[in-house]
Amino acid sequence: FDTFGIDLTHWKWLIELCFLVVLVSINLIAVKVFGEVEFWFSMIKITLICAMIATAVVMIVIGYHYPAVQIHGVDHVSPAGHAGFDNLFANFSFAPNGWMAFLMSFQMVFFAYEMIEFVGVTVSETKNPRKVLPKAINEIIVRVLIFYVGALMAIMCIVPWTSFKPNKDGSFASPFIMVFQYAGLNWASALVFFVVITAASSALNSLLYSAGRHLYQLAGESPNPTLNKIGQVSDRK
């Protein structure tokens, strides 16, 4: 909301509470509801990434040149440039901001691979785990190449790494917003914001699912009868 100049400082607690109530309700209804919601959350994220990659490909093919643009969330004007593979190697430097900055970037990479243990939590509620899980795990490398490496290459072909400059407060603009605005799609910034909200909701939804399953396991194994009752669930699937 800060990106669009909307001050919700005094209402953040209410927004957070509403999101929490909705996501907890989803997890309490049935696991199939959780799965359906996660499916659509994932589809929204995948659609945005594919749209961004497709936009970048079109810009590269036609040799698109863009003017200097005031990007949403940036306190300075981003320089003019062009779309092309040469942006990947222009002014190339392995660690332009020093080795410490390079090492610090790993925390962002590791963050992207958190919750891998979530695969193990879902085994007990998968219809055919012997068939489904190996397939899902083997497809991870393909998904990483397309949605992670592919997206990074698409962004860097449009926006040279030298164009990423921090604001006065140290923050950076979303590279997705930069690509869309360079393409002249100024309205896409609101779309990216919506996808960020769904991505955060998806992460919280998965955490609630995982926490609920762990609490259920602990309650079932507890020698305390009271905790055993807490671990009782309905027949809904």
Predicted segments — roles?
Residues 8-14, 94-99, 182-191:
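Membrane-interfacial loop-to-helix junctions in multi-pass transporters
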Residues 18-25, 103-110, 191-205:
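Hydrophobic alpha-helical transmembrane segments of multi-pass membrane proteins
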